[in-house]
């Protein structure tokens, strides 16, 4: 065969591997027919993935918009309670790492004292989470209102704005902070191949009771098997998981 006036040969070994992986029914073809079959199969797969992502984004926009409207009374009551308790800011913004390492600003209802970030450095030796995350079951930085809204995951509701904006999805791995990502092993970085979400597999399977390695394993499992049906099932499982309060601290 020729291309641009130069002779080249097909990599027959590569074609055989591609054929073995993608061909069905025992049909034996060779050369360009194998290559054409593979390209067609790959193109169809890309089209399905693109369509699924588009539908997922539509679901994110609709779900976050409806959620913001229906939960507006909860927003108002929570904001008032936070303000009354210590007079500090209602919301807490923090840089998080999204898909492919993109940094974005994620929002929560403030559940800790105003100087919580500075206090964290003095508590690092009491970290109860394995891996690169920081978790304490009895974190002294959490306020009285904060304990309630964290138990019911109300503190996460402002992230519906992040979903509406497109920084996050309703379902996907929880977005890590840059300091955690800096300590990731290469295998851990697969979590960054997806848009982060409000809920995920480990959020409905024990939340903070699951160690870092377990969270990564479940996130990768979601990456390799994600579907709209699976997302809907995860959203439905999130409701009883939140109400139970298991692993929330």
Language-model features: locations:
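N-terminal hydrophobic signal-anchor/signal peptide
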Residues: 1-69, 249
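Residue-level recognition of specific faces of alpha-helices
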Residues: 80, 93, 108, 141-144, ...
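Short glycine/proline-rich turn/loop motifs
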Residues: 39-49, 124-129, 139-142
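Short, glycine-rich, amphipathic interfacial segments at transmembrane boundaries or analogous
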Residues: 92-140, 199-217
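A short, structured surface patch at a secondary-structure boundary
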Residues: 132-195, 234-242
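A hydrophobic, helix-centered structural microdomain
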Residues: 45-119, 228, 233-249
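Acyl-group handling in specialized metabolite and lipid biosynthesis
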Residues: 46, 219-223
């Amino acid at each position: 065969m020729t291309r641009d006036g130069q002779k080249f040969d097909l990599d027959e070994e590569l074609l055989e591997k591609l054929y073995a992986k993608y061909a069905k029914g025992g049909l034996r073809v060779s050369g360009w027919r194998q290559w054409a079959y593979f390209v067609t199969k790959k193109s169809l797969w890309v089209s399905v993935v693109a369509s699924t992502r588009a539908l997922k984004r539509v679901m994110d926009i609709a779900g976050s918009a409806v959620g913001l409207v229906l939960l507006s009374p909860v927003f108002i009551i929570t904001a008032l309670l936070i303000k009354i308790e210590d007079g500090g800011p209602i919301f807490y913004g923090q840089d998080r790492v999204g898909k492919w390492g993109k940094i974005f600003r994620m929002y929560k209802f403030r559940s800790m004292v105003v100087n919580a970030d500075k206090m964290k450095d003095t508590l690092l030796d009491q970290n109860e989470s394995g891996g690169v995350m920081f978790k304490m079951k009895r974190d002294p930085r959490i306020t009285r209102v904060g304990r309630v809204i964290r138990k019911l995951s109300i503190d996460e509701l402002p992230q519906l704005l992040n979903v509406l904006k497109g920084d996050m999805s309703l379902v996907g791995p929880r977005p890590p902070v840059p300091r955690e990502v800096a300590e990731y092993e290469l295998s851990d970085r697969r979590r960054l191949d997806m848009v982060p979400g409000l809920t995920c597999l480990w959020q409905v399977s024990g939340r903070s009771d699951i160690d870092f390695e377990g969270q990564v394993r479940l996130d990768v499992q979601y990456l390799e098997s994600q579907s709209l049906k699976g997302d809907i099932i995860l959203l439905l499982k999130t409701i009883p998981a939140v109400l139970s309060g298991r692993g929330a601290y």
